[in-house]
């Protein structure tokens, strides 16, 4: 946490040409000689050359306002869209306010993303924190953009979606991304008409490293203001958390701290928790913060410290798979390592449909067996497989082609997703569907997929 604490100690400096600079404390050494080492957060990487220094006597606060929606800021919170400065309604500490755990509300409203692999088998609740585990070259940005386009609340009546925009906002924070990624999200928000409800914070790859530590906290402070003061439902997209963790390692090394696993600081778990835990719902407030951090796993390694520690803190993960991507399946979401820990409370009768949990469990079981059969087929050949094995193979192919695969602008309701699931399960005789109760089978198994709800 030392690197983050350092980033909160600010000074205002004047450069040799009289230019004003803002800097954050990097190291403190009063034993050999009384000195503070600072690093600029508003200029290029490297030491800050200043001729005068003014201590602010305060921690780093950010101006917040509802007018920040529709605006683009740099990683330090300065407008970069040629618009006026923000007329602040308040100045808030970027580390946020501690929330009494007793005042947190358990997330129970499902967010419909329109993506079957998520809605059907890894449902997201409003107020949840669930990361996208991806890797270099995979379409994680496209998936996140599709979720932003299509996300809405499932109403308790049939086939009704809540797309109301007056109380919905998106806060997008980019850390260490290239210009192409920043342009992709900005143009996508503009094209689907949601830019007025989006606040962007962009720290590009050529921006200062220490700014990368501040950017997600600026975004989350803004999100907390919009959620708890303006009572909006806020979706926070953070990309790329791997760049953030590497910035943390760089600042930690500059401070000569004792390194931990793979050179990352020992407090990285605690530091990531200070970001991820700023999601959820609070008693007495109508707003919510749903977090979808995106991280790229180095060398596709899920045991790397960044995805490993993230998985401990967050409530599940959405796993983007390279093998599915290589087979031209979009979105390439592998449902087996994916998980949503809050799914059980967001689905079922009165929220989605009473068969939702049973269909999800049976699809998981059949897909897992299908994967085993596929591996066995590679060893013994198709001729050695039983008739049941061939059914699982057929299910495997149709599941990936019809259930997981869909278009980037295809928005399926949760009811359409469940109907596709039943179509696939009808490949098997009723006796083989052992994870679905007989009463549910009697009601849904014989039904024609075109039947009305």
Swiss-Prot record:
ATP binds at residue 341. Signal peptide: none annotated. CDD domains: ATP-synt_V_A-type_beta_C (cd18112), V_A-ATPase_B (cd01135). InterPro entries: ATP-synt_VA_C, ATPase_a/bsu_AS, ATPase_F1/V1/A1_a/bsu_nucl-bd, ATPase_V1-cplx_bsu, P-loop_NTPase, V-ATPase_su_B/beta. One of its GO terms (cellular component) is proton-transporting V-type ATPase, V1 domain. Keywords: ATP-binding, Hydrogen ion transport, Ion transport, Nucleotide-binding, Transport. PANTHER family: V-TYPE PROTON ATPASE SUBUNIT B, V-TYPE PROTON ATPASE SUBUNIT B, BRAIN ISOFORM. Belongs to the ATPase alpha/beta chains family. This is V-type proton ATPase subunit B.
């Amino acid at each position: 946490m030392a690197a983050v604490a350092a980033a909160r100690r600010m000074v205002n400096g004047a450069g040799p040409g009289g230019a004003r600079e803002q800097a954050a404390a990097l190291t403190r050494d009063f034993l050999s000689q009384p000195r503070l080492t600072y690093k600029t957060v508003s200029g290029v990487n490297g030491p800050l050359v200043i001729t005068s220094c003014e201590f602010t006597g305060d921690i780093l606060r950010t101006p917040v306002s509802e007018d920040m929606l529709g605006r683009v800021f740099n990683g330090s919170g300065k407008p970069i869209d040629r618009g006026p400065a923000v007329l602040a309604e308040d100045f808030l500490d970027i580390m946020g306010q501690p929330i009494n755990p007793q005042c947190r509300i358990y997330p129970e409203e499902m967010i419909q993303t329109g993506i079957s692999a998520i809605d059907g088998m890894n449902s997201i609740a409003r107020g949840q924190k669930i990361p996208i585990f991806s890797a270099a070259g995979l379409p994680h940005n496209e998936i996140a953009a599709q979720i932003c386009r299509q996300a809405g609340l499932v109403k308790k009546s049939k086939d009704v979606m809540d797309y109301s925009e007056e109380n919905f906002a998106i806060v997008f924070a980019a850390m260490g991304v290239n210009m192409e990624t920043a342009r992709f999200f900005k143009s996508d928000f503009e094209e689907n008409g949601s830019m007025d409800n989006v606040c962007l914070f962009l720290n590009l790859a050529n921006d200062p490293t220490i700014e990368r530590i501040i950017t997600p906290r600026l975004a989350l402070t803004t999100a907390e203001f919009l959620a708890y003061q303006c009572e909006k439902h806020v979706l926070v997209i953070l990309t790329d958390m791997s760049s953030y963790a590497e910035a943390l390692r760089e600042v930690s090394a500059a401070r000569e701290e004792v390194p931990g696993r793979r050179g990352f600081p020992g407090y990285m778990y605690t530091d990531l928790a200070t970001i991820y835990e700023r999601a959820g719902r609070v008693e007495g407030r109508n707003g919510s913060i749903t977090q979808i951090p995106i991280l790229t796993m180095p060398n596709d390694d899920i045991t790397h410290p960044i995805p490993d520690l993230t998985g401990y803190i967050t409530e599940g993960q959405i796993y983007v798979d390279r093998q599915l991507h290589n087979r031209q399946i979009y979105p390439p979401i592998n449902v087996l390592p994916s998980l949503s820990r809050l799914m059980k409370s967001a689905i079922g009768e009165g929220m989605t449909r009473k068969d939702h949990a049973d269909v999800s469990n049976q699809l998981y079981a059949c897909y897992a067996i299908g994967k085993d059969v596929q591996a066995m087929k590679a060893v013994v050949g198709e001729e050695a497989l039983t008739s049941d094995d061939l059914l699982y193979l057929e299910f495997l192919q149709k599941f990936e082609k019809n259930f997981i695969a869909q278009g980037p602008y295809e928005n399926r309701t949760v009811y359409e997703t469940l109907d596709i699931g039943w179509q696939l399960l009808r490949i098997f005789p009723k006796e083989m569907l052992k994870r679905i109760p007989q009463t549910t089978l009697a009601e849904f198994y014989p039904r024609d997929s075109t039947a009305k709800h």
